[in-house]
From Swiss-Prot:
Taxonomic source organism: Emericella nidulans (strain FGSC A4 / ATCC 38163 / CBS 112.46 / NRRL 194 / M139) (Aspergillus nidulans)
Transmembrane intervals: none
Role: Required for conidiophore development.
Protein localization: Cytoplasm
InterPro entries the record matches: ARM-like, ARM-type_fold, Mo25
Keyword entries, A-Z: Cytoplasm
Protein's name in the database: Conidiophore development protein hymA
One Gene Ontology CC term in the entry: mating projection tip
């Protein structure tokens, strides 16, 4: 099918790449920016056809391979990531399509299990991923950058770059050889900006940032479990403050639901046990049960039940539950009682009522084994 792209005035992939790079450099200059936008859009549209083909003709594998090599040689992916928010609307869409296709492109007879663009980013240009994250600083680039990031996040090495990078703008991004999983983060890296983007962004930006944030935290479980264990205090301080207590209903509800998913995932058992030891975390969850909005109450319930179902509650958690026993026993039977078709929810409420009834009169020090759980007990606190 290569003839489709070589007939007439069509140019070689390397020519298109160099032309786009030159136009991107001119786009930075206010005096020429408006003049190059149309030509840049045309060039990106042509590149999209090279990687995507048309309904009538498939893209040429050899031509896509040549295009990828030229883009890597000219560092065009980085330049596109930096400039994405300045591109015209259609050009942003085309850039998103180009990125998404080449991120998963594998040449015939390739030896690496990962696509070459992913390997290149990880070993040579992780700054591409960091700049795509920074696309959330601009409403124009938020959604295309988010779509590209979620395609890249299918690979755990990309998640590691986002989680562990602490570079400032203009500095080199982290390499995998520099990752120190046991060293707590300072809260200055790009990952921590997601809390701001989700909490303070426009509705569309916030929603897209949350989707990417959730992908980072739920897709590669072994990576994230270690990260949360090392950065537990700072992460959940940010999560509880900016997301669970967000003024946005959508952010609040989605964040509580995500919190429940994280805590009830077997891979995060140790993280869950640390979270439910905290009396302050329990107070926050009990506050959610009294929210004016039923879906916030419902999602809050699925976090609250983890505290109550834990057979080895901390003294702080026991004290709060014991002090509020009578009120909880009056409150829970009537809690969301209109959910008559949800048998599991009804059974869980009954279970929690029974657990609260069985609480001792005074807190009892939990066993040492509860504070140092083994993997064999990983599901003892989950309410079915």
């Amino acid at each position: 099918m290569a003839f489709f792209f070589n007939r007439g005035r069509s140019r070689q992939p390397s020519d298109v790449v160099r032309s786009i790079k030159d136009l991107l450099l001119r786009l930075r200059e206010p005096s020429t920016a408006s003049k190059v936008e149309d030509e840049l859009a045309k060039q990106l549209s042509q590149m999209k056809l090279m990687v995507q083909g048309t309904q009538e003709l498939e893209a040429s594998t050899d031509q896509v391979h040549a295009l990828v090599q030229a883009m890597l040689h000219e560092d065009l992916l980085y330049e596109l990531a930096v400039a994405l928010h300045n591109l015209p609307f259609e050009a942003r869409k085309d850039t998103q399509t180009i990125f998404s296709h080449i991120l998963r492109f594998k040449p015939p007879h390739g030896n690496s299990p990962d696509p070459p663009v992913i390997s290149y980013i990880v070993h040579n240009r992780p700054e591409i991923i960091i700049e795509l994250c920074r696309g959330y600083e601009h409403s124009q680039s938020a959604m295309p950058c988010g779509t590209i990031l979620r395609e890249a996040l299918k690979f755990d090495v990309i998640a590691a770059i986002i989680l562990y990078d602490q570079s400032k703008e203009g500095e080199p991004a982290i390499r995998l050889t520099e990752v120190q999983p046991n060293v707590p983060q300072r809260g200055t890296g790009v990952f921590w900006r997601f809390f701001h983007w989700i909490d303070r962004g426009t509705f569309e930006l916030s929603a897209d940032a949350f989707t990417t944030f959730r992908e980072i935290l739920t897709r590669h479980k072994s990576l994230v479990t270690g990260y949360l264990a090392t950065n537990f205090d700072y992460f959940f301080a940010q999560f509880n403050t900016f997301l669970v207590q967000s003024e946005s209903y959508v952010t609040k509800r989605q964040s509580i639901k995500l919190l429940g998913e994280i805590l009830l995932d077997r891979a995060n058992y140790s993280v869950m046990m640390r979270y439910v030891e905290s009396g302050e975390n329990l107070k926050l969850c009990m506050k959610l049960l009294r929210d004016d909005r039923k879906m916030v109450q419902y999602e809050g319930f699925h976090v609250f039940k983890v505290f109550v179902a834990n057979p080895d509650k901390s003294v702080a958690v026991q004290r709060i539950l014991i002090n509020n026993r009578d009120r909880l026993l009056r409150f829970l039977p009537k809690f969301l009682e209109d959910r008559t078709d949800d048998d599991q929810f009804t059974d869980e409420k009954s279970f929690l009522v029974r657990q609260i009834e069985l609480l001792p009169k005074e807190p009892i020090e939990p066993s040492r084994s509860a504070r140092e759980p083994s993997r064999s007990t990983a599901n003892t606190t989950t309410v079915a």
